[in-house]
Regions:
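Signature of Gram-negative outer-membrane beta-barrel scaffolds
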Residues: 1-50, 63
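Transmembrane beta-strands of outer-membrane beta-barrel pores
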Residues: 2-4, 24-30, 44, 57-63, ...
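Gram-negative outer-membrane beta-barrel transporters
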Residues: 13-19, 111, 116-119, 139-220, ...
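Outer-membrane beta-barrel channels and translocator barrels
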Residues: 15-17, 45-49, 91, 103-106, ...
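C-terminal beta-signal and adjacent terminal beta-strands/loops
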Residues: 212-220, 243-322
């Protein structure tokens, strides 16, 4: 496949505090033909540079590589099926961002808020639900929308303490045949925080970070599947201590996943039978519930929504070479 292209953009200074950036990209795909991708960005900043507004809109084009991007296709637990020839995904996206810096005597407060909206056509999504033994890939016969808002608060103090907290509320949905469904393995709410403090006398920096994830809709293997349809709320917390040595080396040590959170033990269905040797199938390849498999399950790791690694210690060195 050949993909020559050209990109042109022009930045226009409307005045001292307003800028407009216009661009267009042209690609010729030897399989899919001519592709045009325009974009526009607007920026306004206050005279003192403590307030900034950014607006952007643009079009995107992407040829999906399923086996590189979706590792679920490589687990071997399900056969992979493609419906027809996959068309490239296209999208239109818009974003509005506002930043406000507030300067105090001994600290700086930064507020950062964004609204984003992306409309996809020809979206390629894995279908886990039509057949529990397959992952079916096809272009969506409808549309997919990802929209949401995010807010970040960042505070930096002169004494070496810095605080960061952010939250994102999203609606990622698929609309097909006028039916709206929530996309699998996507959370509506997520949050992040970071607390950093430098002990100048010791040359040590302490970083405490964490993430909060809301429930995700998960792929089940059928109506008899005993696992929950949605994941629980969960938090991942980490702490790290960094010691700087003579400006050329950093020694760091820390703990990941302080609360030792792991997904439920039954997240991988029938993990004890990865080749389905004890599973009975009918002539159409559907699972038949039996005495040793009353829920009619097969080996399947697609339900796993976060890392199976619990609490763990790490240690390392960073060298700076001038």
């Amino acid at each position: 496949m050949d993909l020559p292209g050209i990109f042109i953009q022009d930045e226009i200074n409307l005045n001292e505090w307003q800028k407009l950036l216009l661009g267009i990209r042209y690609d010729y795909n030897s399989i899919h033909g001519n592709v045009f991708s325009p974009r526009a960005n607007y920026k306004w900043s206050s005279i003192d540079k403590n307030e900034i507004i950014r607006l952007s809109v643009g079009n995107g084009f992407r040829v999906a590589n399923v086996f590189t991007e979706d590792h679920a296709a490589l687990t071997g637990s399900r056969s992979v099926e493609f419906k027809d020839n996959l068309k490239p995904e296209t999208s239109w996206n818009g974003n509005a961002n506002y930043i406000k810096n507030i300067i105090f005597k001994e600290s700086i407060l930064t507020l950062d808020g964004s609204f984003f909206y992306t409309y996809f056509s020809n979206r390629i999504l894995p279908d886990y639900e039509s057949n529990s033994n397959k992952i079916i890939y096809s272009n969506l016969d409808g549309k997919s929308v990802s929209k949401g808002i995010s807010l970040n608060v960042d505070v930096m103090f002169q004494n070496g303490l810095s605080l960061l907290a952010g939250a994102t509320l999203m609606d990622v949905s698929v609309i097909e045949k006028q039916v709206k469904t929530r996309q699998l393995l996507t959370e509506r709410f997520s949050s992040v925080w970071s607390i950093s403090y430098r002990l100048k006398s010791l040359g040590v920096t302490i970083d405490y970070t964490g993430n909060v994830y809301g429930p995700m809709r998960l792929p089940l293997l059928g109506r008899l599947d005993p696992r929950d349809e949605y994941s629980q709320w969960f938090i991942i917390q980490n702490i790290q201590f960094t010691k700087k040595i003579r400006n050329i080396m950093e020694l760091y040590v820390g703990v990941k996943n302080l609360l030792n959170f792991t997904p439920p033990s039954n997240s991988i269905a029938r993990a004890f039978d990865p080749f389905d040797k004890k599973v009975q199938f009918d002539n159409e390849g559907q699972v038949i519930p039996s005495s040793n498999n009353p829920n009619g399950l097969t080996f399947d790791p697609s339900y796993v929504f976060t890392s199976n690694q619990g609490i763990r210690l790490f240690l390392g060195l960073n060298f700076t070479i001038y």
